Amino acid sequence: MASGGSGGVSVPALWSEVNRYGQNGDFTRALKTVNKILQINKDDVTALHCKVVCLIQNGSFKEALNVINTHTKVLANNSLSFEKAYCEYRLNRIENALKTIESANQQTDKLKELYGQVLYRLERYDECLAVYRDLVRNSQDDYDEERKTNLSAVVAAQSNWEKVVPENLGLQEGTHELCYNAACALIGQGQLSQAMKILQKAEDLCRRSLSEDSDGTEEDPQAELAIIHGQMAYILQLQGRTEEALQLYNQIIKLKPTDVGLLAVIANNIITINKDQNVFDSKKKVKLTNAEGVEFKLSKKQLQAIEFNKALLAMYTNQAEQCRKISASLQSQSPEHLLPVLIQAAQLCREKQHTKAIELLQEFSDQHPENAAEIKLTMAQLKISQGNISKACLILRSIEELKHKPGMVSALVTMYSHEEDIDSAIEVFTQAIQWYQNHQPKSSAHLSLIREAANFKLKYGRKKEAISDLEQLWKQNPKDIHTLAQLISAYSLVDPEKAKALSKHLPSSDSMSLKVDVEALENSPGATYIRKKGGKVAGDSQPKEQGQGDLKKKKKKKKGKLPKNYDPKVTPDPERWLPMRERSYYRGRKKGKKKDQIGKGTQGATAGASSELDASKTVSSPPTSPRPGSAATASASTSNIIPPRHQKPAGAPATKKKQQQKKKKGGKGGW
């Protein structure tokens, strides 16, 4: 073996060492030996190539790229396009990697593999799908399973981010990775129950494969399963089972997986569950979305969703400037996106600046007419919250693509009815019916609108206007007796002769299968429980004077106990129910008898109160003109001294005891 200082070792011997170290996977020692060869011949192309490979194997991508860029002239004939592109890819210089691959002299299989990865990172899924299809079709080696996994990942990405219906590529779900990607594709199509079943299958396959792998550590199964469990929790969240989803999310976070992308997505989903509640927990979780390298692990739409939720969290926590800063940044990145401007408008509304919010929305609507419908709906909602119903109706009627929809017609008619603008409500009906007449005549929505318009006009006494609608409905269905009856009723006030003529179309009672026995109906006694609604007749209670019910009442009525000193010969005082001060014979107290009647007066008189009223105590007594609330409300004011956590109900014994003690202190006249 050549030592570091032995300069006499031959180059072939050094190459033998490099070969041996490479076969053993000891690329650190192989790199040292290659450097010795380069000291002998610094322009040795093979040695430079080996050095780049050793650096890549050791994860030193920057240093490997520097070697390639430094020796560009020497390596011109021996192209290292793959190594250079791979270093750029691992350093997240994706655009540079794409240029390197496209400028390569020869497109080898390994370059195509890398090309597919680069296209996937750039989210150019259609091109990526074509590359992987070609690789799966034309490659025959031990990496076929990995290529199929990558192919299924592209299909899942298209389904989720581009809402493309995935085509059946005939991929067998033989591994947990393939099952996981298939489930992701189903989630993008909204097939949540089926996706959950496939994820459960992926979990079983993952546990089985990891148990068979003797080289894996105990942390490997948990790391692999965390991704599957995270997707299961997401399905539970979409199904509205937020408690189960939250529990599963927190279990994954406790495992502390090393995948920063997974942690960021889970933290973001927890924040969406918390919304404006539990913001302290959301503030802790949002730190996970700021981890280093997250931007390279997630797609653009995932990163955008995280930023949206950061802006909303800032709004919920009253960080107005932070909210505006994030939403403005999002708007600059995606000027046509709705959410940033909606968040800004919501923040302005929280600050009671509704007018500015409406102006902001109107400006966005003018700049992006393709999104005007959603913006105008929000503007109308703000106008309604301000109580300006008429203006809200005008905004809603300006949405051309929605003004004929039954839901919009219903909302407009309701608001116009609230404003008592019946003419405008009828105009809304007329315009909607005319649209369906031109585009979808005789459709269910068309006939439903005509019927609702007729009912509305009849409700507000517009019988003449309702006649044309009812006639149109009756012509569509001459057997509709209900519509015919409405039409006859309307004509009876406008044209009695026409009403009489139409009444001939009504079926006779014999032809109607009502199955009513007229004689039985006339002979029936009628309602038998009418008396329940009113009071009982006096005579009804007489037969029950000695019945069982009366005995029960006698048992309930117990005679009250008489006082011990009760004298039946003495007539009770007729004014005994009045307070003493309001009785006719009350003359007030005589002077000089206060001390003798302590404890004999009305409730609430104490020694403290009597001492405060004693004018003989001039030195230690409080001022004769008490401050408001210091005399009659003395007990109430002192109770406020007790801290909130020690407060007890006013009727509690401890409170009364404390009040009495304080009143006794007051009797001494001290401050």
From Swiss-Prot:
Residues 527-671 are annotated as: Disordered. There is a cross-link at K391 (Glycyl lysine isopeptide (Lys-Gly) (interchain with G-Cter in SUMO1)). The modification Blocked amino end (Ala) is found at A2. Signal peptide: none annotated. Residues 379-509 are annotated as: Required for the interaction with the SRP68/7SL RNA complex. The modification Phosphothreonine is found at T571, T618. Its main location: cytoplasm. GO terms for cellular component: cytosol; endoplasmic reticulum; signal recognition particle, endoplasmic reticulum targeting. Residues 564-585 have a biased composition (Basic and acidic residues). TPR repeats lie at residues 11-44, 109-142, 226-259, 406-439, 447-480. The modification Phosphoserine is found at S630, S635. Disulfide bonds: none annotated. Residues 552-562, 655-671 have a biased composition (Basic residues). Keywords: Acetylation, Cytoplasm, Endoplasmic reticulum, Isopeptide bond, Phosphoprotein, Repeat, Ribonucleoprotein, Signal recognition particle, TPR repeat, Ubl conjugation. GO terms for molecular function: 7S RNA binding; ribosome binding; signal recognition particle binding; TPR domain binding. Component of the signal recognition particle (SRP) complex, a ribonucleoprotein complex that mediates the cotranslational targeting of secretory and membrane proteins to the endoplasmic reticulum (ER). The SRP complex interacts with the signal sequence in nascent secretory and membrane proteins and directs them to the membrane of the ER. The SRP complex targets the ribosome-nascent chain complex to the SRP receptor (SR), which is anchored in the ER, where SR compaction and GTPase rearrangement drive cotranslational protein translocation into the ER. This is Signal recognition particle subunit SRP72.
